[in-house]
Protein backbone atom coordinates (compact mmCIF):
# COMPACT_ATOMS: atom_id res chain seq x y z
CA UNK A 1 0.00 0.00 0.00
CA UNK A 2 1.35 3.44 -0.90
CA UNK A 3 2.06 5.93 1.85
CA UNK A 4 -0.82 8.21 2.74
CA UNK A 5 -0.40 11.74 1.43
CA UNK A 6 -2.01 14.82 2.92
CA UNK A 7 -4.48 16.56 0.65
CA UNK A 8 -3.21 19.87 -0.66
CA UNK A 9 -5.41 22.58 -2.13
CA UNK A 10 -4.13 24.38 -5.22
CA UNK A 11 -5.37 27.62 -6.73
CA UNK A 12 -4.68 27.83 -10.47
CA UNK A 13 -4.93 31.30 -12.02
CA UNK A 14 -4.92 31.23 -15.83
CA UNK A 15 -6.03 34.25 -17.81
CA UNK A 16 -4.99 37.24 -19.84
CA UNK A 17 -3.92 38.42 -23.25
CA UNK A 18 -1.92 37.35 -26.32
CA UNK A 19 -1.37 33.72 -25.28
CA UNK A 20 -3.19 30.42 -25.72
CA UNK A 21 -4.51 30.40 -22.18
CA UNK A 22 -6.81 27.43 -22.86
CA UNK A 23 -3.86 25.28 -23.88
CA UNK A 24 -1.79 26.30 -20.86
CA UNK A 25 -4.70 25.67 -18.50
CA UNK A 26 -5.25 22.22 -20.00
CA UNK A 27 -1.59 21.24 -19.69
CA UNK A 28 -1.20 22.60 -16.18
CA UNK A 29 -4.27 20.74 -14.97
CA UNK A 30 -2.76 17.61 -16.52
CA UNK A 31 0.47 18.04 -14.57
CA UNK A 32 -1.49 18.68 -11.37
CA UNK A 33 -3.71 15.63 -11.92
CA UNK A 34 -0.62 13.43 -11.81
CA UNK A 35 -0.80 14.02 -8.04
CA UNK A 36 -4.15 12.66 -6.84
CA UNK A 37 -3.91 14.43 -3.48
CA UNK A 38 -3.69 17.87 -5.13
CA UNK A 39 -7.18 19.34 -5.40
CA UNK A 40 -7.40 22.31 -7.76
CA UNK A 41 -9.69 25.32 -8.07
CA UNK A 42 -9.40 27.41 -11.24
CA UNK A 43 -9.55 31.21 -11.34
CA UNK A 44 -9.21 33.57 -14.30
CA UNK A 45 -8.13 36.67 -12.36
CA UNK A 46 -6.84 37.62 -8.91
CA UNK A 47 -10.13 39.30 -8.00
CA UNK A 48 -11.09 36.62 -5.45
CA UNK A 49 -7.86 36.85 -3.51
CA UNK A 50 -9.43 35.42 -0.36
CA UNK A 51 -10.45 32.31 -2.29
CA UNK A 52 -7.08 32.03 -3.99
CA UNK A 53 -5.16 32.34 -0.74
CA UNK A 54 -7.37 29.76 1.00
CA UNK A 55 -5.22 27.12 -0.74
CA UNK A 56 -1.76 26.05 0.35
CA UNK A 57 -0.37 26.21 -3.20
CA UNK A 58 -0.70 28.67 -6.07
CA UNK A 59 0.06 28.24 -9.79
CA UNK A 60 -0.25 31.16 -12.22
CA UNK A 61 -0.03 31.48 -16.00
CA UNK A 62 -1.16 34.98 -16.92
CA UNK A 63 -0.41 38.02 -19.06
CA UNK A 64 -1.85 41.42 -18.19
CA UNK A 65 -3.58 39.89 -15.19
CA UNK A 66 -2.27 41.23 -11.88
CA UNK A 67 -3.84 41.82 -8.46
CA UNK A 68 -5.28 45.14 -7.48
CA UNK A 69 -2.64 46.86 -5.33
CA UNK A 70 -4.95 46.61 -2.31
CA UNK A 71 -4.87 42.80 -2.63
CA UNK A 72 -1.10 42.37 -2.74
CA UNK A 73 -0.73 42.30 1.09
CA UNK A 74 -2.98 39.21 1.15
CA UNK A 75 -0.74 37.51 -1.39
CA UNK A 76 2.32 38.44 0.64
CA UNK A 77 0.70 37.07 3.79
CA UNK A 78 -0.12 33.83 1.95
CA UNK A 79 3.59 33.40 1.24
CA UNK A 80 4.86 34.58 4.60
CA UNK A 81 2.67 31.98 6.28
CA UNK A 82 4.16 29.14 4.27
CA UNK A 83 2.37 29.13 0.91
CA UNK A 84 4.14 28.15 -2.29
CA UNK A 85 3.67 29.90 -5.62
CA UNK A 86 4.70 28.51 -9.01
CA UNK A 87 4.66 31.58 -11.27
CA UNK A 88 4.93 30.91 -14.99
CA UNK A 89 5.83 32.95 -18.05
CA UNK A 90 3.76 36.16 -18.27
CA UNK A 91 2.92 36.24 -14.57
CA UNK A 92 5.40 39.13 -14.30
CA UNK A 93 3.97 40.99 -17.33
CA UNK A 94 1.81 44.12 -17.39
CA UNK A 95 1.80 45.68 -20.85
CA UNK A 96 0.40 48.61 -22.79
CA UNK A 97 1.22 50.29 -26.10
CA UNK A 98 2.32 53.90 -26.46
CA UNK A 99 1.25 56.22 -29.27
CA UNK A 100 3.93 54.75 -31.52
CA UNK A 101 2.64 51.23 -30.90
CA UNK A 102 5.60 50.17 -28.79
CA UNK A 103 5.04 48.00 -25.73
CA UNK A 104 5.96 49.13 -22.23
CA UNK A 105 4.98 48.55 -18.59
CA UNK A 106 2.72 51.24 -17.08
CA UNK A 107 3.17 52.12 -13.43
CA UNK A 108 0.88 51.20 -10.59
CA UNK A 109 1.77 47.61 -9.70
CA UNK A 110 5.21 48.02 -8.17
CA UNK A 111 4.34 46.17 -4.94
CA UNK A 112 3.23 43.11 -6.89
CA UNK A 113 6.38 42.95 -9.01
CA UNK A 114 8.59 43.60 -5.98
CA UNK A 115 6.93 40.66 -4.24
CA UNK A 116 7.38 38.43 -7.28
CA UNK A 117 10.99 39.57 -7.64
CA UNK A 118 11.00 40.56 -11.30
CA UNK A 119 9.19 42.52 -13.98
CA UNK A 120 9.10 41.64 -17.67
CA UNK A 121 10.38 44.42 -19.91
CA UNK A 122 10.81 43.05 -23.44
CA UNK A 123 11.85 40.10 -25.57
CA UNK A 124 13.66 39.70 -28.90
CA UNK A 125 11.98 37.93 -31.82
CA UNK A 126 11.09 34.33 -31.01
CA UNK A 127 13.96 32.03 -31.91
CA UNK A 128 15.85 29.07 -30.44
CA UNK A 129 18.20 29.92 -27.58
CA UNK A 130 20.31 28.14 -25.01
CA UNK A 131 19.36 27.89 -21.34
CA UNK A 132 22.29 27.61 -18.94
CA UNK A 133 21.91 25.71 -15.66
CA UNK A 134 23.51 27.71 -12.85
CA UNK A 135 22.43 25.68 -9.81
CA UNK A 136 22.43 21.87 -9.87
CA UNK A 137 21.65 21.46 -6.16
CA UNK A 138 18.03 22.66 -6.20
CA UNK A 139 15.43 19.85 -6.51
CA UNK A 140 13.99 21.33 -9.72
CA UNK A 141 17.30 21.83 -11.53
CA UNK A 142 19.25 18.97 -9.93
CA UNK A 143 21.42 17.07 -12.42
CA UNK A 144 20.08 19.15 -15.32
CA UNK A 145 22.33 20.13 -18.20
CA UNK A 146 22.27 23.21 -20.40
CA UNK A 147 19.71 22.81 -23.17
CA UNK A 148 18.49 24.45 -26.35
CA UNK A 149 14.94 25.74 -26.59
CA UNK A 150 14.37 24.18 -29.99
CA UNK A 151 11.68 25.91 -32.00
CA UNK A 152 12.04 29.04 -29.90
CA UNK A 153 10.25 30.75 -27.04
CA UNK A 154 10.10 34.30 -25.73
CA UNK A 155 13.46 35.05 -24.12
CA UNK A 156 12.35 37.36 -21.35
CA UNK A 157 14.43 40.45 -20.71
CA UNK A 158 13.55 41.32 -17.14
CA UNK A 159 14.26 43.84 -14.42
CA UNK A 160 15.20 41.98 -11.27
CA UNK A 161 13.74 43.59 -8.17
CA UNK A 162 14.91 41.34 -5.32
CA UNK A 163 17.58 38.89 -4.28
CA UNK A 164 16.72 35.50 -5.75
CA UNK A 165 18.34 32.11 -6.19
CA UNK A 166 18.93 31.79 -9.93
CA UNK A 167 18.67 28.18 -11.12
CA UNK A 168 18.77 28.73 -14.88
CA UNK A 169 19.48 31.69 -17.13
CA UNK A 170 19.83 32.75 -20.76
CA UNK A 171 21.84 35.43 -22.52
CA UNK A 172 20.36 38.40 -24.35
CA UNK A 173 20.41 37.70 -28.07
CA UNK A 174 19.56 41.00 -29.70
CA UNK A 175 17.29 44.01 -29.81
CA UNK A 176 13.70 43.75 -28.60
CA UNK A 177 11.91 45.13 -31.62
CA UNK A 178 8.54 46.66 -30.89
CA UNK A 179 9.32 47.50 -27.25
CA UNK A 180 10.12 50.85 -25.66
CA UNK A 181 13.11 49.20 -23.96
CA UNK A 182 14.54 47.98 -27.25
CA UNK A 183 18.31 47.92 -26.69
CA UNK A 184 19.90 45.42 -24.30
CA UNK A 185 23.55 44.54 -23.77
CA UNK A 186 24.46 41.55 -25.93
CA UNK A 187 25.26 38.56 -23.75
CA UNK A 188 23.60 40.03 -20.66
CA UNK A 189 22.21 37.21 -18.52
CA UNK A 190 18.54 37.02 -17.59
CA UNK A 191 17.07 34.45 -15.19
CA UNK A 192 14.89 31.77 -16.74
CA UNK A 193 14.17 29.92 -13.49
CA UNK A 194 14.59 31.34 -10.01
CA UNK A 195 13.44 30.82 -6.44
CA UNK A 196 12.59 33.59 -4.01
CA UNK A 197 11.98 33.14 -0.29
CA UNK A 198 9.18 35.15 1.31
CA UNK A 199 8.90 34.50 5.02
CA UNK A 200 8.10 30.81 5.52
CA UNK A 201 6.92 30.51 1.92
CA UNK A 202 8.52 30.54 -1.48
CA UNK A 203 8.10 31.56 -5.13
CA UNK A 204 9.41 29.58 -8.08
CA UNK A 205 9.34 31.68 -11.26
CA UNK A 206 9.86 30.08 -14.70
CA UNK A 207 9.91 32.34 -17.77
CA UNK A 208 9.54 29.58 -20.38
CA UNK A 209 6.09 28.60 -21.60
CA UNK A 210 5.03 30.94 -24.38
CA UNK A 211 2.14 29.64 -26.47
CA UNK A 212 0.10 31.48 -29.09
CA UNK A 213 -2.50 30.28 -31.56
CA UNK A 214 -4.34 31.89 -34.44
CA UNK A 215 -6.97 33.66 -32.31
CA UNK A 216 -4.87 34.83 -29.38
CA UNK A 217 -4.03 38.35 -30.58
CA UNK A 218 -7.59 39.69 -30.46
CA UNK A 219 -8.54 42.52 -30.46
CA UNK A 220 -5.30 43.65 -32.11
CA UNK A 221 -5.61 41.03 -34.86
CA UNK A 222 -8.59 38.92 -35.86
CA UNK A 223 -6.30 36.15 -37.06
CA UNK A 224 -2.63 35.56 -36.23
CA UNK A 225 -0.95 33.84 -39.16
CA UNK A 226 1.50 31.57 -37.42
CA UNK A 227 1.22 29.34 -34.39
CA UNK A 228 3.89 29.61 -31.69
CA UNK A 229 4.17 26.41 -29.63
CA UNK A 230 6.96 27.66 -27.38
CA UNK A 231 8.76 25.22 -25.10
CA UNK A 232 5.69 23.19 -24.13
CA UNK A 233 6.49 20.29 -26.47
CA UNK A 234 10.10 19.86 -25.34
CA UNK A 235 10.77 16.84 -23.09
CA UNK A 236 12.98 18.95 -20.82
CA UNK A 237 10.11 21.39 -20.28
CA UNK A 238 7.80 18.57 -19.18
CA UNK A 239 10.51 17.30 -16.84
CA UNK A 240 10.94 20.72 -15.26
CA UNK A 241 7.19 21.19 -14.93
CA UNK A 242 6.80 17.84 -13.17
CA UNK A 243 9.63 18.70 -10.81
CA UNK A 244 8.02 22.08 -10.20
CA UNK A 245 4.73 20.41 -9.25
CA UNK A 246 6.63 18.29 -6.73
CA UNK A 247 8.40 21.39 -5.40
CA UNK A 248 5.01 23.10 -5.08
CA UNK A 249 3.78 20.69 -2.42
CA UNK A 250 7.02 20.09 -0.55
CA UNK A 251 7.73 22.31 2.39
CA UNK A 252 4.23 23.78 2.54
CA UNK A 253 3.53 24.93 6.06
Task: Name each model-derived stretch.
Residues 2, 9-13, 17-97:
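Helical hinge/lid and interdomain linker segments adjacent to catalytic or ligand-binding clefts
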Residues 17-18, 48, 65, 92-94, ...:
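Short, solvent-exposed loop/turn segments at secondary-structure junctions
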Residues 66-143:
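A glycine-rich, often tryptophan-bearing local segment used as a flexible ligand/cofactor-contacting loop or short
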Residues 2-8, 34, 182-192, 197-253:
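Extracellular ligand-binding/catalytic regions of CAZymes and related secreted enzymes
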Residues 24, 71, 136, 237-241:
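Stable alpha-helical elements in mature extracytoplasmic
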Residues 33-37, 41, 53, 118-211:
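Catalytic beta-strand/loop cores that center a nucleophilic Ser/Cys/Thr
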Residues 82, 144, 248-252:
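A general structural signal marking secondary-structure boundaries and capping sites
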Residues 23-25, 97-101, 179, 216-219:
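Short aromatic-enriched loop/helix-cap "lid" or pocket-rim segments at secondary-structure transitions
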